[in-house]
Amino acid sequence: MRKISANYIFPVSSKPLKNGIIEIDNTGKITNIIDTKGDLKEIAGLEFYNGILVPGFINTHCHLELSYLKGKIKSHTGLTGFVKQIAKLRDKFNETEIKDKIAKADKLMQHEGIVAVGDIINDTISLEIKKQSKINYHSFIEIYNINSEKAQTSFNNGLEILKTVKENKLKASITPHAPYSLSEKLFEIFKNYYADKQEVVSIHNQESEDENKLFENRSGNLAEMLKNIFKSYDIVSNINNSSLQSYISYLPKNNNVLLVHNTYTSEKDIEFAENYSDNLFWIFCPNSNLYIENKLPQIDIFVRKDAKITIGTDSLGSNEKLSILEELKTISNYFPDIPFSKLIEWATINGAKALKMENMLGSFEIGKTPGINLIENVDIKTFKINENSKIKVIA
C-alpha cells in the first residue's frame, strides 16, 4: 500500500485537490482518494512530490512500426514528400533492426508516462513486444487499395492480421488508412463489416491541403502522385466537397471513430461531421504536423465547438520524441488560452474513452489502475506548463 501526495492532484473526473492523497495497492489500483482541503498533516509512509499528479497519458495515434525512421526523414516536405521518403527507405531495414527500434520506442513511451496507445499496424511484427509491454495497446490494422478489383482481397488481408492479433489476446480492429488510399468499394466493404459492431476505428483525416484539393476538383500534388503511380483510381467519387465531407458517410457511425491530424479541417467540416455521428474523436499530433506540413490544426475552433479531442504522437519518422507532454507543450505554446485542465483531459480521459479503456484508465477514481504521473517544473499558481516541464512516473 502506498500513499502519494503532491502540491495538486488532478483526478480529471473531479475538481483538483490541493495537497490531496491517493492511496494505491501493490497492483497500482486506487483504493482511496483523500481531500485534505489543502491541510496536509504528517502521515507515516506518505510520499510527497513537488508538482502536479495526473493520470497516465493515453497516446491515441502512433506508428510503432515506423520507429526505425527516426532521424531519417527530412522535415517540412509536405505529406507527399513525406510519403515518397518512406517509400524509398522502407526496404533498407531488416526485421531485427525494426523490432529493436519498436522495443525501444515502447520503453520510451513508458518512461514518458504513457499507459495506453492506439497503434497503426500493417503486419504482426510488433505483437511480441506488445504482449510483454506494460502499455495497453489497441492495434489499428490499416487497409488500403484504390483498385476496386482488389478491394475484397485487401480487406481479407486485414482480417487475417486481425485474427492473429486476437489470437495473441491483444485488442485490435481494421481501419482505413486515409480517404485517398481506399477505393469506394473497399470503403463499402469496411463500413458493412462494422455496421453491426461497436468497435474503435481510425482514419488519417485532412492532413494536407492537397487532400482537400483531390476531393474538391482532383487537383494538387496528391492527385498528381496518384496519377503517376496508378493508371486509374477509384476513390470516393463525391466531388466539389472537402475530403471529410466527401467520405464521412463511409464511416460506421455506431463505432468510435478517431479522426487523426485534422490539419486542414474547417469549421464547416467540424459541424458536418458532428452532425453525422456522436462518436467522433478528433486526434491532434501537433509536433508531427509541424514536422511534415509546418502547420497546426485550428485547435481553438475545435474547442469552441466542444469537440471531443485526444492527443497522439504519430511516429518517430515525423517526431523527435513519443511524448504526450511534449505535444501538450506545443499546443500550450501556440494556443495559450487553452487551460491546463483541458489539456490534461484530452491527454487522459478523452483518450481512454476513444479507445474504450475508460473503465480502468484515464482518471483518478477508486477501483481504477490509471497510472500516476508527476508533472514537475510547472507553475503551481497558474497551472502553466513550460519548456522545462517534465514527467516522472510515480506508479
Give the ranges of each region predicted by the language model:
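Hydrophobic faces of well-ordered beta-strands that scaffold small-molecule active sites
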Residues: 56-60, 117-118, 137-141, 172-176, ...
